[in-house]
Structure formats: C-alpha cells, structure tokens
Amino acid sequence: MSSRGVRAAGTDGNDFQNRQRIAQHYQESAQYKSVLKWFFVPHFLILVFMWLKVGSEFLRYNFGWKNAFFERLDMPAAYPWEYVWCLSFIPIVLALSSFQRNKLKVLHYAYYAEFICGIFPCMIGLGGQLPELLEYANDMEGSNTPTFKGIFPMVIIWYIFFAVALQIHGFSMYFMHHLAAAWAPVKRD
C-alpha cells in the first residue's frame, strides 16, 4: 500500500530496520524452549529405563509378577532414592505445560521440582553409594558389591548414571532459570 504524495521529509525509505527486528527476549525465549526440549529427550529415555527397573521390581515383590527377561538380568533391589527419582517426569510435564503461554509461575514450579525430584535423589544416591564405590576400588576381587548379570559392578553403572543425570538436571535448571528471566516482566526504576 503506497501513500499519496511525496516521501516524508528526512527519510530515504531505509528506516524500516528497527521494525523488522524481533525483540531479544522473544529470541531468547524460543532458543531456551528449544534447548530445554532437547534436554528432556535424554532425560525421558533414562527415565523409561529406570521405570522398567523399579516397576518390574515393584510388580515382582508386591503382585508376584514374574518375567524371565527381568529375572535373567539379575538386578539388585532398588534403593529408596530410585523411587523418588522416578518422579522426575514431573518437572518435564510442568515445563512443557508452561511453554505454550509463557507461564512463569509454572516454570518456577518446574525449576524447584527439578531440584527436588532430580538433583536431590541423585545427591543422596551419590553419598549412599560412595562407601560401596570405595570398597570396590580398594578390593575389586573380594568386594561384595552387587553386579549386573553377575559380571559388571552396579556401583560403576550408578556413578555413570549420576554423571549423566546430574548434567541433564543441572543444565535443565540453568536453562529454566534463563528462560524465566526472559519471560519476567522488565522492572522499571
């Protein structure tokens, strides 16, 4: 749509650039949402394996359910922190539900749930498994550490899990914090 008459005085027609830029906080919001979704993928994959481990044990001991596959794996009993970590799907659900309308309060709930259901159980597991790790490191042949399929020590598997899970939870909290900062209203002095 063109205007009638001559061009406005003092412009050469190149003053549209300021209207074509997207505000920085919108760019950051889209970027952090995308990154968080990518962190939720490995978190959910690990969560599925943990649900299988803990769920099979729960069904076996409480309902007498038997499955040849899980019996062949010869997994040790689940620790209490594993049951709490299985609730770490809650921050994923909260964060994803906050994305559509940029609900800051729901994102804050997801942030704190990430700590309570994700990092806190992992830290308890780290501390609880430390004596077992030290025992295994000092005497690999004579230690009584539970094994996976009778071969590989579970304490090593747990510490690999802790390394991966703590990074996923830590980076998720980091990006949730920055996403909340992008969504927060600007404070005027």
Swiss-Prot record:
Family: Belongs to the jagunal family.
Subcellular location: Endoplasmic reticulum membrane
Record keywords, A-Z: Endoplasmic reticulum, Membrane, Transmembrane, Transmembrane helix
Entry annotated with the keyword Endoplasmic reticulum: yes
Highest taxon of source: Eukaryota
Membrane topology, from the record: Multi-pass membrane protein
A single GO cellular-component term on record: endoplasmic reticulum membrane
Residue intervals annotated with topology Lumenal: 56-75, 127-150
Transmembrane segments: 35-55, 76-96, 106-126, 151-171
Protein's UniProt name: Protein jagunal homolog
Topology feature Cytoplasmic, residues: 1-34, 97-105, 172-189
Ranges in coiled-coil conformation: none
Broad class of the protein's primary localization: endoplasmic reticulum
Any Gene Ontology biological process: vesicle-mediated transport
InterPro entries, per the entry: Jagunal
